[in-house]
Amino acid sequence: MGMLKEFKEFAVKGNVVDMAVGIIIGVAFGKIVSSFVSDVIMPPLGLLIGGVDFSDLAITLQHAGEGVAEVTLRYGVFLQAIFDFIIIAFAIFIAVKAINTLKKKEEAAPPPAPPEPSSEEKLLAEIRDLLKQK
């Protein structure tokens, strides 16, 4: 039972839960970026280059034959993956920069002034001072 208890404590710690949420959001964000690159960015870019569909770009090393599969280097798909990575890296950079800016603002803010002592606290302080004098 000790190991189960330790696992429960580990699993419900804030860092583990935060990390799990971050991974789930990251996977979903990755799918969005992949779709954005392949469906929005690459078609106009291919059109500008001369009607090229990047996903079809490949170098055939061996043509298909009887019982032999075609061997190709699909460098167009690789280029799309590079665009995915660049966009995801840039988005993460912007997010981290924004978070760091917010943290600096929180650190730079002066701590709030202590509240003015209540009338009871002032009276108790006066009594304390009078007792010290005697």
From Swiss-Prot:
One annotated Gene Ontology cellular component of this protein: plasma membrane
Transmembrane stretches, start-end: 16-36, 76-96
Main location: membrane
InterPro entries referenced in this protein's UniProt entry, alphabetically: Mechanosensitive_channel_CS, MS_channel, MSC/AndL, MscL_channel
Molecular function terms, GO-annotated: mechanosensitive monoatomic ion channel activity
Membrane association type: Multi-pass membrane protein
Assembly description: Homopentamer.
Name under which the protein is recorded: Large-conductance mechanosensitive channel
Species of origin: Thioalkalivibrio sulfidiphilus (strain HL-EbGR7)
Lineage, opening ranks: Bacteria, Pseudomonadati, Pseudomonadota, Gammaproteobacteria, Chromatiales
